[in-house]
Amino acid sequence: MVAFYAYMDTHETNPGRHQTLIFDIAKTNIGYAYNTNSGLFTSPDHGIYMFTWTIICESYGFVYSEIMINSAPFGSILTNSQSITNDHTVTGIVVAEVYQGDVVYILTNPNQPIQRGILSDTFHRTSYSGWKIY
């Protein structure tokens, strides 16, 4: 069995373009395939996996993010609260065939700017999770 759930312990106040997001608190890490120091999930074996990631941006901000398999984008989301005075939350979900040794991680988009910060605290968590389906 392989499954993990991790979140950012604190806000990321100044994320840059093309930055790997590190979810440094792993609440679940069955199989120990997620690394809290690097933000990378390394697949222990071939299979079909589901991955989700949730990004919370500050009010009047926006964050583009992508889920990467090795060095290729597999999915993306935009968290945008530019026109509202509240924080904004978006979750991306993908199902992917992943091979042993493949690396899956969340990256800020290399071509899009980021405005304001990524939020994560006791009341709302920016998080990343994945598990093997088959």
Language-model regions, residue ranges each:
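Extracellular jelly-roll beta-sandwich "head" domains, especially the C-terminal globular C1q domain
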Residues: M1-Y134
